[in-house]
């Protein structure tokens, strides 16, 4: 494994700026026990490892072989199976960036996140935003066919990872009612609109772009068209009530009507 020190200049400019924006949005995290799930080559795990106890989980052995190791963190190879090895309420913070779109068992993964997360612990999820992808297809790639396909609710495609299975921000709360979205921010609202690739390399331009991206990231009208959403979720102590799975039986409805007619405050009891 290459133990040479690496920094963000080793990444393409768009990826370097994406990391910096996400890290700024995360704020200063210290002295926390963290999982980075789907850690890739470990750029974020390495960054957080400087001041935290970090465990990175990644299924791709090639990515693990190329991982960044400037700072100390524990690397595990695997997926949701590795999450199941941890006891309940073990971690303070979970990182999951651009991962759930590429999995079929994402609801199970999110529920495992909640299980291993301490009460009031937080999860950082970066996810694709369908509207932003439509913008990309039309403005940058001139691909109207794919834009129409996305607007019709179909999946997208990433050259490196395959099908992008889009989901809505609120789906996460539906998969696991213990989790509540406390913050939503946009990412890459303007960054990719600049098609002059040479200017992307200009450090001064990068700083100005990051500044304006951060400024609009909390504004809903810009979040709506951002390429990505950055969600912060918190584990609550109280589970929210789930909607009923079936409609009330005809017998219950009849008894409710009878109770109303008699003007009585009758407590209904379902009979099997």
For every predicted segment, state its role:
Residues 84-93:
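A short acidic, Gly/Pro-enriched loop at the edge of an enzyme's catalytic core
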Residues 107-122:
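A short glycine-rich, Lys/Arg-flanked "PGG" loop and its adjoining helix->strand segment in the class I
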Residues 93-105:
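A short SAM/SAH-binding and catalytic strip from SAM-dependent methyltransferases
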Residues 1-32, 43-47, 63-66, 124-150, 195:
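Conserved class I S-adenosyl-L-methionine
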Residues 183-240:
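A C-terminal cap/extension of S-adenosyl-L-methionine-dependent methyltransferases
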Residues 41-82:
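Class I SAM-dependent methyltransferase SAM/SAH-binding core
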Residues 161-179, 184:
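Short alpha-helix
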